[in-house]
Amino acid sequence: MTRTDSSSASLEAFSLPEEDGGFLLKHLYLKHSSFSHRFSWVDTFLSGFEGKRIGRKGIQALETAINKEIMDRGYVTSRVYIEPQDLSKGTFYFTLLPGIVSDIRFSPDTWGTWRNAAAVHKGSLLNIRGIEQTLDNFNHVPGQKAHIRIEPGEKEGDCVLLIELQRERPVSLFMTLDNSGMKETGKLQQTYGLRISNPLSMNDLFYFSWNGDAEPGSDRKGTHGVNLFYDIPLGKDRMTLSYAHDDYRQTVDYSVVPFISSGKLERTRLTWSHLLQRKAYSKTDLLAGILHKTRHSYIDGTEIGVQRQKTTALELGIHHKRYIKESLVEGELTYRRGVPWLADPGPTDGMAGEATTRYNMYLGSLHVTTPVPVAEDYRLRYTMDLYFQKANQPVYGSEFLSIGGRYSVRGFDGENTLAAESGVVMRNELAIPLGKSGQEIYGAWDYGRVYGPSTQYLLGKELTGCALGFRGEKGPFRYDGFIGWPIEKPEGFQTAKRTYCFLISAEI
């Protein structure tokens, strides 16, 4: 169930107007209908005026206050009204005229279906939050823009929802080029992808991408991978399925006999989300999912059996998004539990104090974006991203949180990292728009810390770095580049004095 009601400051501050005469009303209530349970707060509100003398102005003021509150709670086509009644008996009631959705339909010449995207249904009580969720489901599809008109129905209080869709580019191609790779496997990395909007005509989304190193061909080092993604709305729910397969190979030259080390990683995730609450400036979703991973490691093509991994984990979390004036705050908290389904036990599972695949882990993230006024018509933008991981038991390295690189602590080249069972990363950024060009320069300051049993084998636990960058877009192209510097690192931790990073992407 989606909650849309809350206590109202305007009702709490309401007072009856002063007037002479009136009737002594011992009982005030809302006349019951099939939807009265949605408006139980009206009875609570009215009970506060029982035993008082109320005249015509007072009754009209109550009606106005209740209808304003109904509107504020999103029931934009519902209202209360006053039926003829004898007030001399000391009883007074309001009658509810519920706003019912009598029909939902597409505008003419629109193909596809609205049924799985609609968060409202025929015969339901119309709430504007349901329309907003429906719009989100339609507009979640790239190249698709929805508008919903509320038109009067045949009966008083009834309404018809007319959905108008604008669609463009149902199929698009995209590519990226960056230098996020490792020296041993290829610094230059490339991605090519295909995205299809509405592949099943159900406001769904599918994309496929291939990625790999972009350096001269060699059998002795490199990476390549495949990603699949499918997403479909189901009213107040959403289902997402993703799959990733990555291969890498590198030559180990510092041994007596050089050899090729390689590996394969697969990751499959099924996620379900459900809208718990939606208000004018916030929404909350319940999240649940299952994550399955496999890992294989090889030396000169021969698998290292002891390093083989096949794990499954369940996830349960909550996601909250809130607008506070012109700022956005978005947070997520997830509990992850390793389970034996479709999984193989780890070599040290069940050993006290050793790594296990049956772990309990908490993960969280917080995103804040807020404008920083510096002149009447000019603002900077501050962004903060915080995420953490807390494992309650020792876990295998594949579950570690790693810091030191462009996606964690900028200013480090990523060739060496600090990784452990638990940790926290905070990324701060101040962006300066360059007029209305769609470009900006930005400064970044990042901090990361890892902790857990494995830190005893590390050179240290903390990294701090900074960066100065430039990003923007022009036509189908987007670009981002920055120079980063390490500020604080453990003694002996090897990284470049300056890190140069870039990313170029295009979509057609």
Report each predicted region and the residues it spans:
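Extracellular loop and loop/strand-boundary signature of outer-membrane beta-barrel proteins
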Residues: 123, 178-180, 213-216, 254-259, ...
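Transmembrane beta-barrel strands of outer-membrane/channel proteins
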Residues: 150, 175-179, 192, 206-212, ...
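Gram-negative/organellar outer-membrane beta-barrel architecture
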Residues: 111, 127-327, 495-507
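Residue-level signature of outer-membrane beta-barrel architecture
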Residues: 196-198, 232, 274-276, 320-322, ...
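Strand-connecting loop/turn motifs
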Residues: 75, 143, 170, 201-203, ...
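Predominantly the C-terminal beta-signal and adjacent terminal strand-loop region
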Residues: 473-508
